[in-house]
A protein has these predicted regions:
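Gly/Pro-rich turn-and-neighbor structural signature
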Residues: 3-90, 200-256
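A generic structural motif
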Residues: 7, 110-112, 126-128, 138-144, ...
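Internal mixed beta-strand/loop scaffold within catalytic domains of large alpha/beta enzymes
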Residues: 56-134
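Glycine-rich, often proline-containing surface loops adjacent to acidic residues and nearby aromatics
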Residues: 69, 100-102, 131-139, 185-206, ...
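Short helix/loop capping segments that flank catalytic or ligand/cofactor-binding pockets
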Residues: 83-85, 115-117, 144-147, 263-265
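Compact, glycine/acidic-enriched structural inserts
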Residues: 128-172
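Long, charged, mostly alpha-helical binding arms that flank functional sites
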Residues: 158-211, 225-228
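Long, contiguous binding/interaction regions
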Residues: 261-285
Length: 285
């Protein structure tokens, strides 16, 4: 019989390990720029009436000279969906409202407009089903074709190792998902997005867990390279203004359309951790 409790524990351990490695690398980048910035970690605990073990997480935030604001949240929560929300969740519903979710979510907003902002998250959920989801997308205020191509190539390599059609499917899903309908524009230059990689049996779990780990490794490999390439580029006041207006679009997407934001708010998550994706400053013209 499949042991979802043990599998959740393994996924959680991986997400925490990935968090530690990413945060260490971001602190290294700050040190290279002459900054002493470090992550500040805050633990939080979820509350749910009648639930003795609702779970919680740890939110890490750093405000540096290169990474103006970066937030990394790792959480593991257990509970029961409200009936109307349960109906929207894979494998849930009125007869199966219980869930467990563990995952890592990261958003980095950069001080230099030439350095792309970025989002990455991966997660493992169980309802009456168990599945992995996640992805990452690059969000440059000033796009560079080289950066875009290398970011996509890193995720394509991760996808190709696990499924011949994965990259095309998950890139198209990202293009559809990271779109701002009321603006008629994409949030950034894309990446990959996947969900509902069902783990019906131990073999499927191991395969999808391996893919999810490779997505995390791809991010950890490529994004610091892009930051180091652009962080010393001189920028103008016009460049900064372009960045701040673009950040407004990013905030609109996350507050109106983002699934993770909705899931966190609907399941009693930590509000500060949920909204850590918002930029430190933005403008609207």
């Amino acid at each position: 019989m499949q042991d979802w409790i043990a599998q959740t524990a393994r996924a959680r351990a991986w997400f925490e390990s990935l968090r530690d490695r990413i945060c260490a690398e971001f602190e290294n980048i700050e040190a290279e720029a002459g900054s002493a910035a470090k992550f500040d970690y805050t633990s939080w605990h979820r509350e749910e009436a009648g639930n003795p073990n609702p779970g919680g997480g740890t939110r890490g935030v750093m405000k540096g000279q290169v990474l103006e604001k970066v937030g990394v949240n790792v959480s593991t929560v257990h509970g029961t969906f409200a009936p109307e929300f349960a109906a929207t969740i894979h494998g849930a519903g009125a007869e199966n409202p219980g869930f467990t979710a563990t995952g890592i979510s990261l958003v980095a907003h950069m001080a230099n407009p030439h350095v792309p902002a970025v989002h990455m998250n991966t997660r493992f959920l169980t309802t009456s089903k168990a599945w992995f989801g996640g992805g990452g997308d690059l969000n440059p205020p000033i796009p560079y074709p080289q950066d875009t191509a290398e970011f996509h190539a890193a995720f394509q390599a991760a996808c190709d190792a696990h499924g011949a059609d994965y990259y095309d499917r998950f890139k198209a899903w990202a293009d559809d998902y990271f779109f701002i309908p009321h603006r008629g524009v994409h949030r950034g230059v894309g990446g990959i997005f996947y969900d509902h990689l069902d783990c019906d049996g131990d073999t499927a779990f191991e395969a999808n867990f391996a893919f999810t780990r490779d997505v995390g490794e791809a991010f950890l490999d490529i994004f610091p390279k892009l930051v180091r390439r652009r962080m010393g580029t001189a920028f103008t006041a016009a460049d900064k203004a372009q960045q701040l207006e673009w950040r407004g679009r990013y905030a609109e997407f996350n507050l109106v359309y983002d699934r993770g934001t909705l899931f966190g708010l609907k399941t009693g998550g930590n509000v500060d951790a949920i909204l850590m994706s918002l930029p430190p400053e933005a403008t609207w013209s």
